[in-house]
Amino acid sequence: VGTTADSRQYTLAKLQYLQWCGFCKSSQEVVFLCSPNLLNEKSFRHISPESEHYFRPATWCVQLLCRDIPAAPAFQHEWYLSNIPSQLDAPQEFFNYTSGRWISNEREQLEARRIIFSVEGLKSAAAKVLGVSNSFDMTKLGEGLFNRAFLLSNSDGADVVARLPTSVAGPKRLTTASEVATIKLMAALGIPVPKVFSYSCDAESEVGSEYILMERAKGIPLLSVWAKMGRKRRGQVMTQLVEFDSKLLAMKLSGYGSIYLKQDLPDSCTLPLSSDPSLSDYCLGPSVERSWWAEDRKMISIDRGPCKPFPIKLTEGTELNEILKAKALREIAWIEAYARPRPMDDLFRRSDSQEDPSAHIDLLRKYVTVIPLLTDYVAFPQPTLLHMDLHLGNIFIESAKQPIITAIIDWQGSEVLPLSLAARFPRMIDYDIGEDPVTVDMPPETEDPSAKADREAVMVKKYWLAKTFQLNPHLAAAFQEPVRKHLLSLWTESGRTWTGELAAFRHDLIQFVDICEQCPISFSPEERTRHKEELEEYNNKVVVMNRLREMLGVSLEGWVSPERFDTVSQANEELKRETANDLCNGNGGFRQEWERWWPFSDR
């Protein structure tokens, strides 16, 4: 927009008085053009990294939030009048992420989680589904890094929860469509979930954002009472979770991918979910798992599924090869198109191989070569859907005394995977208790509170495992599959060699090669020596980073609770300064570079 000098001057003048925003019709991204950051960008480039590459004059338009002002005639691109009302009277906490802060790159993190929408449009949508008046009280119910939930309450006692995704939640349209379909499928299977009243995958609706309107989860969050619950009631919760897994594992699914309602996807990119007639409204489509769409990956034409695993026999794992290969080929395509090595004098530069796109591509191609051999070892390729993030906050129960599960929430990002990849402990009990969690000795009895808590955690996990062996033996066996460690590591690391660490992926691949007979690839002694050096350097960095995070009490990206932000920010600056004093020895230039390198510095 604004490709001529005259039109740009006109726009800048009007921006001082109007609520204008730029809108990319392709990516469904919205950004206020009157923000100071954008006014400084003469080209009006969208500053959100997720949408920057969608910016082309032919696909952008400017929408006026003030309806009676015509667009500048000098603009040659498409213009239209927005139906999104001004947000000046709405609480800014509705649109902004307020549940946490970041001690580095906070501006970008907050911008990625800002949701622009029409409050009145959302209330109107809620009124339609409930058949009541539009006079709702609206409060922010909660938010995570990828969603925001609001409670809309009517004076008649009716209420509804509205769930809106952020720009980093996943692919536009598909993420909401898949979440709704998965929730509806869970209800059909008898797994307690909130009822979906209505939804929109279209950000150009009257709400101005994708949304899901659903009933409020019944009961209380398990998180609020778990610490006070005794073994018996904890065991009751675990038994119910294992029984729900049984219902999921009983489905005979036809392939891999994410779940959709047929009405939300064209037939050309779907597979039937199952041969079961009762599931005929559902289908499998592209995976909405975030790594397939992160950064510029959504710009690449790649195979994201669905993938059918039954061309010959399930046990042959023919299409398990394809799902593993697709992720590796995705990274090859992304590296070829977008990976840019840092200059030799850049302090951020890592090892030579890490900064060499060809080294990544060569190693990924080696991995693709051994995928058929890897899948020969896999005993459980059957398509499986399990909850991806079963923590205490996602489970609701009637009460502490009646721990009957009333709702399981947050099915966003769910996908059907081979059982060998899908098998996981519920995150609420995912404690590390050794290589063999079934036969590990219990920690000794002690009066130490921390040790007692560890003992209780081990007992809960062992109880879940015992019930799983009893009711879901294939799931239990998948945890003990000999190749599982290699399969999971290669599956994970093959999707992030450039943004993660090539040495970690190479290490996983070497370990697998060493256990194989007649492997088609090999690593020379010289390659292994260089790898050992790079792996040691990488492991040292991991130790330092983990130690730093532990000292500051932050996440990997620097997230911290709002009440701790000032204290942690000050501690971070002091650590950075003290470390620079110790290492730089008065060298001002190196000190400046070192402080820029510091893990929790703005980039």
Predicted region positions:
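Long, low-complexity, polar/charged, intrinsically disordered or flexibly structured peripheral segments
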Residues: 294-376, 520, 545, 552-562, ...
